[in-house]
Amino acid sequence: LNGSNTIKIINHSDNDRVFVLSDLPQDYFLEIEVDNENGVISLNYICKDSEKSFISLAATLIPCAILLNYYLDNDYQRIIDSTKEYDYNFDVNCDAFEIFTGFETLSASKYLESTMVEAGIGIPVIHDKYSYCHGRSTLSKTYNNIAIYFNLGTDLDKLLLSELTKYCKEVIVLDSKPTLLSEYNLLVKCMYLTKYIASQKEKDLSGVDYNPIVKKLYRFKSGVW
């Protein structure tokens, strides 16, 4: 991620748009084709070099940016201006990462969960904040878990944040608002967060050492019944 240089538009017409990922236009492209007659929008990925991991900007942040750009009436400069780098500084060693989310922050929490599992950088446990009272709070009493909390500033958020510090080793608070742009920025924060956790554990998110079964399952086409 390179701050305001993360995404740029290099070509634009009524039916076609080409987006560049990072500062190297020759490396990654995401092209959008619009079929107005049939109401179909196609996203086509072009990558110069074969990616070594399923974890990539092309598969996560950029599609979200395309959709966000649509809902912002093609005000892509607003997306660029709002994108920035985020720094973290905490001990990442723990038994599990407890992720506190809700309907408004599902995209970011799903990214965290899948990336932690796929890259092998931590064990994620997803909590719906509104269901946390139903026995799930028992897990936090292990005292060696790290909480990642998506904070919208509600009364429930204030209550949970005041309590979690008593039971968790660390509470990482990611502030957000119930808006599309804010949810996009929350996803960016989570990308920097996973990058930090991976670096502390000396893992490479761009070159995950997958179990051999991964490719077998990825190409599996037989029956499941």
Model-derived regions: residue spans:
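Glycine-rich phosphate-binding loops that contact phosphosugars or nucleotide phosphates
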Residues: 1-84, 143-146, 150-176
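Phosphate-moiety recognition in structured ligand-binding domains
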Residues: 165-225
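Proline- and acidic/polar-enriched loop/turn elements at helix boundaries
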Residues: 23, 128-129, 176, 210
